[in-house]
Regions:
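Short glycine-enriched nucleophile-adjacent loop
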Residues: 121-132, 138
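Conserved alpha/beta-hydrolase "acid-adjacent" motif
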Residues: 246-252
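Conserved HGGG/HGGXW glycine-rich cap/lid loop of the alpha/beta-hydrolase fold
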Residues: 38-91
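Conserved alpha/beta-hydrolase catalytic His-Asp/Glu region
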Residues: 149-153, 169-231
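Catalytic histidine-centered segment of alpha/beta-hydrolase-like enzymes
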Residues: 271-284
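Active-site loop/oxyanion-hole signature of alpha/beta-hydrolase fold enzymes
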Residues: 74, 83-115, 119, 285
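Short beta-strand/loop motif that positions the catalytic acidic residue
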Residues: 233, 239-241
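Flexible "cap/lid" loop of the alpha/beta hydrolase fold
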Residues: 129, 137-167
């Protein structure tokens, strides 16, 4: 893949990133290109790394392109085949999940361990219900259940109607206002993450992409999940949360545990919504221990 740092507009966004952080990420982007497949008339891009006997379907967050996940992809690919898709501009969760299933079929993967963090956790919860036979296990990280009757859902619907009227620049600012509160403190250690965040928001995502992200969020909140949804599904579930994550206060964490009473739950401390960055090794260890336990059961 072409060196993104040769683009002055993009390189400027990474100017404050120390070379020790930037160079491994730069090499990842150069050495690993997206694969492409058309599913239902929609073109999908995705990473396909590793060659282990089992596969992981890694579902990225709201910004739709799995650049944030690069270091996890490399480490998980040491033991598993890893499929990490970008999200195209489709407006429903069903369409998104149908595309994901199409990628797996195209790659000859019958079942995968499905892992979703934040917005990717929304997608994962729909996927396991729509394609239970393709879901070997479910890892949900820093995400939440649906609240179809909540006032916040009504606000999301209004926001989507307004967003359609806005130019792309205003739409990016609106999305950043929503996401900024989930970002960690801007320290030197987090410089790369903030560079990636800026590139995704300012360069990578089009107006159509952002509108589809919002539309799928509204669509997700219309679902009504119950603890009985997966009663006949034989897979196991891991839920990871952090006690000070603004998206999952205590009442939401309790709702989540009631929705998935069979789940193994791990609670991190002090890292908010950014545990996968701030405690990357510990984050991966919890997931790997869970998957290793499946093989030992």
């Amino acid at each position: 893949m072409a060196d993104f740092m040769l683009e002055p507009k993009i390189a400027k966004l990474y100017r404050d990133v120390p070379l020790a952080q930037l160079e491994p990420y730069r090499q990842f982007r150069i050495e690993h290109d997206f694969k492409h497949v058309t599913v239902g008339g929609v073109t999908w891009e995705y990473y396909d790394l590793g060659s282990g006997p089992e596969a992981r379907l890694m579902l990225t967050g709201a910004l739709a392109i799995p650049y944030f996940d690069w270091h996890h992809l490399l480490r998980f690919a040491e033991t598993h085949r890893v499929i990490a898709p970008c999200y195209p501009a489709v407006d429903t969760m069903d369409a998104l999940c149908d595309g994901l299933a199409g990628i797996l079929r195209h790659e000859g993967i019958e079942r995968a361990h499905v892992q979703g963090g934040s917005y990717g956790g929304f997608v994962a919860q729909i996927f396991v219900r729509r394609y239970p036979a393709m879901t070997a296990s479910l890892v949900l990280s820093h995400t939440q259940p649906t609240y179809p009757d909540d006032e916040g859902t009504v606000k999301l619907q209004r926001m989507l109607r307004l967003a359609k009227l806005l130019p792309a620049g205003a739409l990016r600012r609106m999305l950043s206002l929503s996401l900024n509160r989930l970002m960690p403190e801007k320290t030197q250690d987090m410089a790369l993450q903030f560079g990636i965040y800026a590139e995704l928001l300012r360069v990578c995502l089009s107006k159509a992409d952002i509108l589809s992200i919002l539309a799928r969020t509204v669509d997700y909140e219309a679902y009504r999940f119950t603890p009985d949804d997966l009663v006949d599904w034989p897979g196991r579930i891991l839920i990871m949360m952090t006690e000070n994550d603004r998206t999952t206060p205590e009442e939401v964490r309790e709702d989540f545990k009631r929705l998935y009473p069979q789940a193994q739950v791990h609670l991190f401390e002090g890292t908010g919504h950014a545990t996968s960055w701030e405690q990357a090794d510990a984050y991966r260890a919890v997931i790997n221990d869970f998957l290793n336990g499946l093989n030992e059961a």
